[in-house]
């Protein structure tokens, strides 16, 4: 199982946090960018993007943004050449953005919020490389894992093998909740559990 580390909450400043993650065994740096419209919270996305240019690890960029914000930010994201860009199923036109991201040679993921059904992405699922199940409500770090989201992971796992995407889960992942998603998720995203600790690598290893 792959580990991606989110840095929404950290005991260090942005640059030092990214350096710490870069020096761990994490598979990806998970980048949460928010527009203050799709979710209430807003990140200083351009500052974050500038800092990410120094990172060595592959990037997975999770865009909690509406359609107009996506159109504005995506050119800057493309310049980063991330491995994955994840958009939300709840926006107006996921199909357009899935196509646009793939045209730039970047793997695309689609995220579903805790109250969004797996069936709602049936029209897109054959065209994505990752399905990200949110196990907390998007926007804030440090929330508790929502147990009911494991049923979505199980439903995705049962889909025909020709559906060629990885299953990821994001939110409330720690050494106690990891067992609930083990065997169901191919990738887990952990944030506060890692970045508020004194030893990032130790926390990452506890999830494997």
Would you name each region that the model predicts?
Residues 3-7, 29-31, 59-63, 83-87, ...:
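Hydrophobic faces of well-ordered beta-strands that scaffold small-molecule active sites
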Residues 6, 162-169, 174-178, 182-208:
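Alpha/beta catalytic cores of nucleotide-metabolism and tRNA/nucleoside-modifying enzymes
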Residues 16-21, 69-79, 116-127, 171-188:
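Catalytic cores of alpha/beta
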Residues 21, 32, 77, 131, ...:
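Conserved, mostly hydrophobic/aromatic
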Residues 30-100:
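N-terminal active-site wall of soluble small-molecule enzyme domains
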Residues 36-41, 114, 122-154, 158-160, ...:
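Glycine/Thr-rich beta-alpha phosphate-binding loop at enzyme active sites
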Residues 43-62, 100-113, 149-171, 207:
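Alpha-helix-loop-beta-strand connector modules within alpha/beta enzyme cores
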């Amino acid at each position: 199982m792959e580990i991606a580390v989110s840095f929404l909450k950290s005991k260090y400043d942005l640059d030092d946090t990214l350096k710490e993650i870069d020096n761990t065994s994490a598979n990806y740096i998970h980048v949460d960018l928010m527009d203050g419209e799709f979710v209430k919270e807003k990140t200083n996305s351009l500052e974050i993007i500038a800092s990410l240019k120094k990172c060595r690890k592959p990037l997975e960029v999770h865009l909690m943004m509406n359609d107009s914000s996506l159109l504005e930010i995506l050119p800057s994201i493309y310049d980063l050449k991330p491995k994955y860009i994840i958009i939300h199923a709840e926006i107006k036109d996921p199909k357009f953005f899935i196509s646009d991201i793939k045209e730039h040679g970047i793997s695309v993921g689609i995220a579903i919020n805790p109250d969004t059904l797996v069936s709602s992405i049936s029209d897109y699922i054959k065209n994505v490389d990752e399905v990200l199940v949110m196990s907390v409500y998007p926007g804030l770090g440090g929330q508790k894992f929502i147990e009911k989201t494991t049923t979505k992971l199980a439903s995705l796992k049962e889909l025909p093998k020709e559906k060629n995407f990885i299953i990821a889960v994001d939110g409330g992942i720690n050494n106690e909740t990891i067992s609930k998603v083990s065997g169901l998720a191919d990738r887990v995203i952990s944030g506060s559990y890692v970045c508020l600790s004194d030893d990032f690598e130790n926390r990452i290893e506890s999830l494997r």
